[in-house]
Amino acid sequence: MGFLSAGGLWASLFRARISPIVETDEVLPLTLIDNIAAARNAILSEVIRFDQVLDVVKLRDGLTELIDKRGWRKLGGRLRLRPNGSLEIHVPREFTEERPAFRFTSQAFDIAIEEHALGSQLPKLSDGPSLQPGSTSVDKFNLIPDKPEKLDDYVYSDRPILALHVTSFTNSCIVTLTWSHVVFGARGIKELIAAWSKVLHGEQNVPLLLGTHQDVLAGIGTDGDKTAPFLLDPIKIKGLGLVRIIFGLLWEIWQHPTVETRALHLPKRFVSQLRQKCMEELGAFCREDPAPFISEGDVLEAWCSRFVAQARADEKPALVTNALDIKDRLTAPWSSRGEYLQNTGCCTWTPVQPETLLRSPLGELAYVIRRSIQELATDDQLRAQLRIFRSLGHTKMLPLFGNPNSRVISFSNWTKFNLFEVTNLGPAVISTSPSTRSDASTSPIGRPVYMHCEAAGDSRMLRNCFNVTGKDWDGSYWITAHLYPEDWTKLEEYMRQTQQHISD
């Protein structure tokens, strides 16, 4: 969701903008989920740190070889507007120096990363739960020339969908992939990095890229696809209720215009103990044998949601939203012959009352989130949700459900994609000698030691928002949090209290 500034509005009204069209380009469609407004307005960057020096030429050439393969040429396309305002991809018949498959840039510092004033502040492992510098600190020295900030930067230029930027030190390397969310999301970046890794290793089993010419979801959520009613329809926020919740968000933005991003490092032992405590609480609450299942992800969402509620110091209900990948949940004509590089994310909405949010055992709150996911992640409910997506088109915002007075708390959990494991750029490592490795490295050769995903542009709308990157090689969780500047001291105290509570 974003707002057009007054200056941007006048500029758009009085400046003719032309999207460059090359008649010989191959035109590829985007999919149902690709074209919804939430995806088309986001530019994402996956920032990956390695504790070895990588050969930038091998990285560039490997990615070039991948995009030249069948189906993968989609990534070398350009985004273009159709007459009805939806988007499509125009792929050059041949990639050249003037029209490359992707944008490539690099920079190098002739010092160790620990000697760099900002590089030394990058997130690192800690014995207990800790707050670390966020993406803003990385961006200050990981400067990407002409980095896209909005959809127009693609549509009104010949910019490729994908960009690769490499920042090198004498003992470390930061690899950044930037793309428009309109083309793919979390599952897509996983498939891209996995295939890139295979190419670098010289493997012949690089998967085909499927669904480039026809949406595998084309027949789902249509009039001919009979589905059950969407469970949350009776509590859809609309009319004056929608005005109220939007006004509440705008009021919060006016009161707290600044949002900061920090990284949370939660060690394996901390998360395991927290989940065990929640399971014990849930067992006492449900009195079932065995107690209902709750995952570490459920527990982390409950824990973060409770922090937001406590930090805001009010009795507002919450609407906890969660991005949900549908690839393994929805019955669709998915083919096993290859992979799909498209958006496969739907959403769950969990209305939570203040009593549960603030005062019930944390295990009970985690179970409320788990139960909501179970109810909304069925085949029938996902089909019903895709029917809603079709009705939205490319202009309308996603619906909200629950109490109009709610505070929205958002989550995106990428743990299931195992990004630390699928990323293997080993053949591009220049040297594995101690002199070219960071002293604190815990990752295998050619594997990441840290990563996060960030969104470009105005971050004021990304508030009370958490992206769970997943587990690293120590089994620790990395979470990117978007909160207020005054929240960090409160969060450190919250972590300390939690540590004491689960250790009792």
Curated annotation (Swiss-Prot):
Pathway info: Mycotoxin biosynthesis
UniProt-listed Enzyme Commission number(s): 2.3.1.-
GO molecular function: acyltransferase activity, transferring groups other than amino-acyl groups
The entry's keywords: Acyltransferase, Glycoprotein, Signal, Transferase
Enzyme class: transferase
Active-site residue list: 181
Leader sequence segment: 1-18
Disulfide bridge partners, by residue number: none
Residues bearing glycans: 84, 413, 467
Phenotypic consequence of gene deletion: Leads to the loss of pyrichalasin H production, but still produces deacetylated pyrichalasin H.
Similarity comment: family membership: Belongs to the plant acyltransferase family.
Function of the protein: Acetyltransferase; part of the gene cluster that mediates the biosynthesis of the mycotoxin pyrichalasin H, a tyrosine-derived cytochalasan that inhibits the growth of rice seedlings, but also inhibits lymphocyte capping and actin polymerization and alters cell morphology. Pyrichalasin H is indicated as the responsible agent for the genus-specific pathogenicity of M.grisea toward crabgrass. The first step in the pathway is catalyzed by the O-methyltransferase pyiA which methylates free tyrosine to generate the precursor O-methyltyrosine.
Name of the protein described by the UniProt record: Acetyltransferase pyiB
Organism: Pyricularia grisea
